[in-house]
Amino acid sequence: MKKCRWSMDRNTDRDPQKQENKKTMNDLAQTSQDGLLVTHVNQTQDLLQLQGRETQTSALEDSEDWLAMHSLKFEKLTLADLISQGTVELEDCNNAVPKVHFTTQTIHHFKSRLSDTIELYQQRMRWLTENSKKAFGLIKGSRVGLLIDSSQVSSGSQTKEFQNDLTGLIDEQLSLKEKLYVLSFGVTINPLWPDPMEVSTSTLQELKLWVKTLQPEGSSNLLQALKKVFAHKELNSLVIILRSCPDQPSEFLSDFIQQSTLGRSVFIHVTTYKCDDHVPSAVLKNLTDALGGYYHCYSPESELYTSRDVVELQVETHKAQGLLSQVQALCHNNPCEELSCMIKEISIEIAKGPFTSLLPKPPKHEAPLTIKFPDLDKTSAEWLKINGLKAKKLSLYQVLAPNAFNPVEEFVPILQKTVAATIHEKAMVQFEWHDGTVKNIHVDPPVLFEYQKQLGKAVQIYEHRLQWLSLTSRRIWGTVCQRRVVILLDVSVTNSMYIIHIQHSLRLLLEEQLSNKDYFNIIAFGSTIESWRPEMVAVSHDNLQRAWRWALGLQCQGSRNVLGALRKAIEVDFKDKNKHESQGIYLFTGGIPDQDVHILSAYVAEAYGGCDLQLNVCLFYVGEPQMDTTPPACYASRTDTATAYKEITQAARGRFHWFGETGIYESDDINAIVSEIEKALNYSQKCAFLVASLKNHSEKELQSGALEKDKPRTLKQSQPKKHYPPKPTAPSVARMSIKDGLDGETSSRLKALKCHPVNAAAQPEKEGTVEQRMKTKPRTRPKLFLFYTEAGNSVGSVYKRYTQGKSIRRINSSIQLPRKDTVCSSQEWTATCRLKRLKLELSKCLGPNCRYQKSVRGPALAEHCTLFPSIEINGVVRHIQWTLWEMETYITCMEKVTRCYVQRLHWLLSGSRRLFGTILERNVCILLDTSGSMGPHLQWIKTELVLLIWEQLRKHCARFNLLSFAEDLQLWQDTLVESTEAACHKAMQWVAHLQAQGSTSVLAALTKAFSFQDVQGLYLLTDGKPDTSCSLILNTVQSFQKERGVKVHTISLTSADRTATEFLRELASLSGGRYHCPVSDKALSGIQGLLTRGFIKERDPKLPLFEGDDLRLLAEEFTRARNLLKQAQVFRSQLLKKNNMKSKVTSC
């Protein structure tokens, strides 16, 4: 027991000047009382209250709270604070020992503050040893039960002194309480009142008279007094004044008090008054320590005085005096020696402190807020109503509407059918409208050019908006737009490592976005709910500062009671939500809520209905929770967590914002802007298509005219001269027109049979090249219906059957790709999207081997090879027969395919799939090697196994079981169990207690796993060769396989042991399973940019050589697609070069 001796001189001086000094010592901002604000009937009570006003605040003030607000740490007067104010320098390059330099002003200021603090502590200690506080200590609580030991009360000076001290206690401290219950105890108990009484002048006077009538009794029956006082449940503080040793043992009293106060908040205060010879102080001190109470000892004869409040102040004073001496030594001694001692002391101090003290803090983290006045922000949806493409009349359909015409269809009575009008292809371009119909568009290039310039300016505005949304507090919270706001902070125990991050995020919000709001409040929630204010308060500079100081004291504890926090906000802060507009709740959380998502969604949908109130979720991702001996209350992967909160926000008509260390993962505000940018790009591409269609028509005209001029004249001279028949009659004209029409169609078809690219310009026919003609199917001949018109002998005709149009080569730009998160093997996944199946081979764009490059016939080379760009592949020259548009379409498709491959690869390397691969079967058993060699990896494996349970087994499997094997087998369950939430929680607890030891008995584990009924897949995780023969295991599995047909998937922690790797490969292949090996951190860091970005760039490195089957098959297909994409980009550059040369020749 710590003892401290203090001056025992009684100080009963109540001089007003001294009382004023006491107020100053306590740093109390107490305004002067020049009159009573409330008038009472009893004037005597008013006078007594005024007389005790000067001591009221001091008496009510708790010593722990006072020391917390005036400690060295709170005042920034610790060793670490001193060193942080210095400057670290290296005097020369060879000396690696840093020196810390302090300015004279810094040292003097620090010394001055330390001296003032020491003086404050000494004044506080003097105050604690005055009047009743010296004899009985500082009484806590507002409803006090007072037990007075009357066993040693006797006549004489001691009795008079004890009565005076009790009277002083009544006047100075008990008069400030709300209720009192007093009794004396000896052999029997003598209560003053039957029940606790309200404190008033009459009750205090009655108590003083009762104290003077106390009579001594023989023994001290404390137990009977405790039974009497604990019957009154409303008391929150119990003061026991002992003058002799109790009759009962301290252990018996401690057990009784603990049982009686179970579920109640009662503070125990034990005081021994001048009885150190009769009562062992150590026994009572241990008793109060066990009860979490307060022990006070007072004995002026032996100069013994023990007070915990004074002891704590003395310890803090000694720290301050020691630090002051070190600061003074800095001015005279070698700074480096002093600093080395300081650093050692800091290390010891940090080791003793809380774990959160080790967390790094931003600069000026605890400084007052620097409040800014923001603009009136809007959500992206509201902002786009003013600045969107439709609002700015920049929709492509709005621009094309004046020049868009519907195709005309009318019923022709004479034909008894509906006839559709046709237009010449040069005049208009057919274009698909937003409603799915097709319209004829008159293309005006200057208008479209100006429109694309306006689109570019709009996209720049949207990009600026995206950048603005990604800065400062908007990166964390999004835009806080409502006028009445409540902030919900997640301070569950899983966020203990991130409490500084949570506080800093709140600081940014308070500084940048809340100063222009009307009302606000902050609610912190873990298992319990803690609110800054009972209800919302008006936004002001002082309130924002107070809220920040409150947030600095938040501690993480408990689980994540999201429903309780929402109920507090909705039912208390927004109890009048139907009477106000522009109201919002911002939930800042880092994990899955304790309650079921459907329950939360149903609650917010009902609570938020019919009022202008929104729930916005700000989810920060801090990584998968680490597995230890205490599993989390509720578990979900980050994707499931995000999905859950998105469902909740949709039910509450709010917005979802998800960010992490690398940036913003998902945001409704950002998605709205990105969608508008994509719409603008889509409009721009359609404009380019319209202009390209118009240019293609013009180029075809020019090329056809040029070909007519370049036709050899010898061809015309060799044609026989035609003999024209005599003028026919009208029916003959009709029949000949049919014949001429058919001949014309036949000749046009013959021209189309020449061997040249379909989309290229037409080539002149060369005689003697019959082998170049292509065989085609006979085309449908047109059929005419002839009739005489009403105008004389004229003949009319209409087509009854039309000729088939020429087939146009198209690149399928609307390819269908599977989802990246499809639960299947890579072999099944790539079977639906491999390049060959999608018909994306690049060889289709190349013609046959060019035979004219080495030919002596110059004209053929000039007329054929100059029209098509050529490229040399493996020593052979081949022509590129695709147009630039077709090549662009192919590149777009390939980029889409490679992006899909990258997203699938990222999915396979994320979550539990990185270690375990993809679980395919519905009924599975996980076999985990827990031999001694697995010790270094066991903690990581346990964390990933918990993630596997919730991410794959819970969602995709019907039943599962876990089995660990070393020398012996350890089963989680005897059979496969359904993957319910309760079963997953039990599995987590089982995983938490796994330990690594012993050998590797793979055969016994597989034999046991094959015995499970209805099991479909086994997943074997190990790090090396088994203890038994590999061939024996393979033969055994093969025999089991013939009977059961269970697939065995193997997982190797390392690929260094090639023998073990080959064994696991063969074991998986034997049963039709897959082999998997997790990717190392080094290999993963090399492709991190590719996976995060989602698409490839030229500078991206090649994929590493994956060992696992799923990753290897996908990587092979990705590499093949990447090579084709690079080759297509080379071909595009050749086509661009050829087109540029053509344009130069045309301009000349």
UniProtKB/Swiss-Prot annotation:
Gene3D superfamilies: von Willebrand factor, type A domain (3.40.50.410). Signal peptide: none annotated. It holds the Pfam family VWA_3. The keyword Protein transport does not apply. Residues 1-25, 701-734 are annotated as: Disordered. InterPro entries: VWF_A (IPR002035), vWFA_dom_sf (IPR036465). Residues 701-713 have a biased composition (Basic and acidic residues). Residues 484-681, 923-1094 form the VWFA domain. Disulfide bonds: none annotated. Keywords: Repeat. This is von Willebrand factor A domain-containing protein 3A. It comes from Mus musculus.
